[in-house]
Amino acid sequence: MYKRQVIGLAPAFGTKQVKTIIDLPHDKVLREIIAGIEEEGLKWRIIKVYHTSDVSFIAHVAAEYSGSGIGIGIQSKGTTVIHQKDLPNLSNLELFSQAPLIDLDTYRKIGKNAAKYAKGESPTPVPTRNDQMARPTYQALSALLHIKETELVDNNKKPQAVTVSFQ
């Protein structure tokens, strides 16, 4: 039997910030990731990571907390990483850096792929879109959201389990 898939949330996720950079509600993002995990037959749990706002480090912590060694990290603005605990912090299995281009279907696929990695499979990476105008269009807002996220970093606070329920 496979261990639970762990999703690591950034410090502001779902509390001080409740939507991604393109206004996708955080609860819908989580629902899709969880649905993808469950479609692969795995269970999940969520932790909030307080000591960093770097999505790669958040994902690595989630991977360390996961029995399978695979974790998902999500920043409040929507940037997401699938990580493996045996990889260096700044390496990863899949990186979704252009948050303005990540839709709910992509979040579901991220959950599915993370679960497949956890089961020892080698899935085809989730297709990502590229838009040359996304960076200049969202750069200022992205920086502002990251600053607000980073203000909530607490180097002395350990990751904590998060309970979620959906209406």
Name these PLM-found stretches.
Residues L30-A63:
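Active-site rim loops that border cofactor/substrate pockets in soluble metabolic enzymes
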Residues Q5-T20, R45-I47, G73:
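Short glycine-rich or small-residue beta-strand-to-loop segments that form or flank ligand, phosphate
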Residues I33-G41, S66, A114-S122:
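Structural signal for hydrophobic packing residues in well-ordered secondary-structure cores
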Residues L24-K28, E32, S53-F57, G67, ...:
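Conserved active-site and cofactor/substrate-binding residues in soluble primary-metabolism enzymes
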Residues M1-Y2:
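Short, small-residue-biased leader/transition segments that mark boundaries at the very start
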Residues V61-T79:
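Short, structured active-site "lid" loops
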Residues G78-Q98:
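Amphipathic beta-strand/beta-sheet edge segments enriched in Tyr/Trp
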Residues G14-K16, I21, S91-Q167:
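C-terminal binding/interaction regions
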